[in-house]
Regions:
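AMP-binding/adenylate-forming catalytic core of the ANL superfamily
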Residues: 2, 7, 34-37, 42-136, ...
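Short clusters of hydrophobic/aromatic residues that line enzyme substrate/ligand-binding pockets
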Residues: 21, 27, 31, 63, ...
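General small-molecule cofactor/ligand-binding pocket signal
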Residues: 91, 141-144
Length: 192
């Protein structure tokens, strides 16, 4: 109740308190409701034959292509099985017909002759098609010298997405990356 000016009353700050309560409820709902008494990180994982756990990526990294929800982690896992591939990252790019198309940034173990790039691209899409299905084949593949990563090793997909969308003016601060120089190299390759 508002008492107006010059009246003694009790103070209650609803907006601050309500935000705290909502944040706590949202936090519990997001991280503790998926599995009883367990914290859900949002990461996918599997256990290999040696008992080791491998984090496969965010389960919410999903790109909708022609009405199909495609997770980036399984596609990247298929790509990374290629003998010449060191690592990969997939982002979605708007497409007139499909809604989104798949854009792959791929780092090779050894710098191959650029004449073999087309063969490697075909091999990669065959692997994806065989393991996941033809809908998951990449529309664009770019071989890059490295992927932008945080100091903890997380691939900065946000930056890769912006480069793929030709939005390089809004990359944000890249100086804190483990390898900030790779961003310029990727931009030079992609937007040449």
């Amino acid at each position: 109740m508002d008492l107006g000016l010059s009246h003694l009353g009790q103070q209650a700050i609803w907006s601050y308190l309500s935000k705290l309560i909502l944040v706590e409820l949202s936090y519990k709902e997001t991280y503790f409701s998926a599995f009883k008494n367990k914290y859900f990180t949002g990461d996918g994982a599997y256990r290999d034959e040696n008992g080791f756990y491998r984090i496969t990526g965010r389960v919410d990294d999903v790109i909708i292509v022609s009405g199909h929800n495609l997770g980036t982690a399984p596609i990247e896992d298929a790509i990374n099985e290629h003998d010449l591939v060191a690592e990969s990252a997939i982002v979605g790019v708007p497409h007139e017909i499909k809604g989104n198309s798949l854009f792959g940034y791929i780092t090779l173990k050894d710098e191959s002759n650029s004449e073999t790039y087309n063969d490697i691209k075909k091999d990669i899409n065959q692997l994806i098609s065989k393991q996941i299905g033809p809908i998951a084949k990449l529309d664009r593949i770019e071989f890059v010298p490295g992927l932008p990563k945080t100091r903890s090793g997380k691939i900065m997909r946000r930056i890769l997405r912006k480069i793929a969308h030709d939005d390089i003016k809004n990359l944000g601060d890249v100086s804190t990356l483990l390898n900030p120089e790779v961003v310029k190299k990727i931009i030079d390759l992609i937007l040449k």
